[in-house]
């Protein structure tokens, strides 16, 4: 399963690197409007401001929203109810499961949970496709 991610401060990028997944794509200001994804993917995103979906992610999803299969959120618990809220919004707007949330760049346990959930999600979707 492809993992597409947006990293505002570098924390999500470090989290993805620690996961060991190779089939990844980082969306940035430079590529968010041009990139087209033609395979199912999991989106990992940070949250900005008071729980908003980053503009880069919104632009990317306008062109690639049909292939999203799940979302993972990153944030800082200091934001209280707005912690990783962008992932809640995306889950609701695109009717995909929110797989998990992690704080800052995640713990070792978070990385293991991510690997497990993405792996199981891929297996479940492959079985359904047969």
Swiss-Prot record:
One of its GO terms (biological process) is protein modification process. This is Protein NrdI. InterPro entries: Flavoprotein-like_sf, RNR_Ib_NrdI_bac, RNR_NrdI. PANTHER family: PROTEIN NRDI. Probably involved in ribonucleotide reductase function. One of its GO terms (molecular function) is FMN binding. It holds the Pfam family Flavodoxin_NdrI. Belongs to the NrdI family.
